[in-house]
Design a protein with these regions (language model features):
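Right-handed parallel beta-helix/beta-solenoid
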Residues: 16-47, 51-67, 359-363
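Right-handed parallel beta-helix/beta-spiral solenoid domain characteristic of secreted/periplasmic
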Residues: 52, 56-63, 69-136, 157-159, ...
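Acidic glycine-/aspartate-rich tracts in secreted/extracellular proteins
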Residues: 53-56, 96-99, 307, 334-340, ...
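Extracellular beta-strand/beta-solenoid scaffold signature
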Residues: 64-83, 104-111, 132-142, 162-176, ...
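Feature marks extracellular polysaccharide-active and adherence modules
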Residues: 51, 93-95, 113, 121, ...
Length: 404
């Protein structure tokens, strides 16, 4: 009897596997230009391989029934999309990351809607066009009510602007119900936030370069959630920000050379800021920005901030514009910030493991620690490095650190 049950179980598995393999197809697009036709033709679960050529989308206007960043969410928005994946799951993979190019010519470049298990990888997304409606959450990739893995994608040069709208075209935006897994992407020279998350969106963002844009490198708003590990955020107006009632965990990021602030939390947001390097930002490095924001700031190196004339916050390392009692602040190196290391809070040096000394990087903008660095083995005693020793302060400390 047991053998018969086992045999029946194995037959059932074989039948399931066979059914899946029969139902899922791989479609290769290497000629022509109508990628959307292939997307429309593909069935749920199919894979589309995009050849090494440029594909130009024919943009289509539509009315977005919800507004991502309006006070009244049910505000209709006039927008456009280049490619749309709707009510099914697809894997869209380029055959050459640099040469498989999707030029979207639209506000919502690649738009995932009600797509429960899709993936986008190994290609370039470029050429977005700003919509005239300022409420449109334009970005190279936009997802709503979708689970999308976005790996090894170059999101570049979506920099079209129009005079009547301040915002431009961003990099990757999560809308209502989006669950995004963004890894090893190069998001550069776009016209608004690098990554933005709106109502009900969540994202895991790892090992990305987010560079040279307007807005924030990573902006998390409303009730969105974000975990960001090992990213470089540079050349934006602002670095990594938590707004509204959002929840952000930001570990081991290099937030450097942005025009305004480095990392802030405002509204009623929670932010866990650990093992980051916040270096050479134009105004303040790190700031609790409201009395209701809360979180933890530990194991960070906050240095050389304040090189620019004051714009959005004082030119200091740490600015307290909130309720300091709601923040755990310890084991940080805060040093050499232009107008002081601290503002609107007493000097934290030699309190809770905080120090104010040269962290001892091996070179300019190379944040590896020298062997004699005061940051080695002096981090939070309850945070361990990958080898089990007490954590280092900075990028290469803690369990999420990248090995060098």
């Amino acid at each position: 009897m047991r053998m018969e049950k086992k045999a029946g179980f194995l037959i059932a598995i074989i039948l399931v596997v066979c059914c899946v393999s029969v139902q899922s197809a791989t479609l290769t697009v290497s000629r022509g230009n109508d990628l959307q036709a292939t997307i429309d033709y593909a069935s749920d679960g199919d894979t589309i391989l995009v050849g090494p050529k440029e594909f130009e989308a024919a943009p289509r206007a539509f009315v977005d029934s919800l507004c991502g960043n309006c006070t009244e969410q049910k505000t209709p928005v006039n927008a456009s999309y280049g490619y749309i994946i709707k009510n099914k799951s697809l894997t869209i993979m380029g055959l050459d990351r640099a040469e498989s190019i999707l030029t979207t010519n639209a506000g919502y470049g690649i738009f995932f809607v009600n797509s429960p298990n899709s993936a986008l990888g190994n290609l370039t997304v470029t050429g977005g066009k700003r919509d005239a409606d300022g409420n449109a959450t334009d970005a190279a990739v936009v997802a709503r009510n979708s689970n999308v893995h976005i790996h090894n994608v170059d999101v570049i040069n979506n920099d079209h602007r129009i005079d009547t709208v301040i915002v431009g075209v961003g990099g990757i935006f999560g809308r209502e119900g989006a669950e995004l897994y963004i890894k090893n992407c190069h998001i550069e020279n776009n016209g608004w936030d690098g990554i933005a998350l709106y109502r009900g969106a969540s994202a895991l963002v790892t090992d990305c370069i987010i560079k040279n844009g307007r807005g924030a490198g990573i902006g998390v708003t409303w009730d969105a959630t974000c975990v960001a590990y090992r990213n470089i955020v540079t050349g934006y107006w602002k670095g990594i920000g938590a707004f509204g009632t959002s929840w952000v965990v930001a570990h081991n990021n290099a937030v450097i050379d942005n025009l305004g602030w480095g990392m802030i939390a405002t509204g009623s947001a929670f932010m866990d800021i650990a093992n980051n390097v916040v270096h050479h930002n134009g105004n303040c490095g790190v700031a609790p920005w409201s009395s209701e924001s809360r979180g933890r700031i530990v194991n960070n190196i906050i240095t050389n901030n304040g090189w620019r004339t004051e714009w959005v916050c004082p030119c200091v390392g740490v600015w307290n514009y909130g309720d300091w009692a709601k923040w755990q602040f310890g084991y940080n190196i805060v040093w050499n910030n232009k107008e002081g290391n601290y503002r609107d809070i007493w000097d934290q040096t030699d309190i809770n493991g905080n120090i104010s000394v040269d962290p001892g990087f091996v070179g300019e903008s190379v944040f590896i620690l020298r062997d004699n660095s005061p940051a080695i083995d002096t981090g939070h005693p309850e945070i361990s490095d990958q080898d089990g020793t007490r954590s280092d302060i900075g990028l290469y400390g803690g369990p999420q650190a990248k090995r060098h």
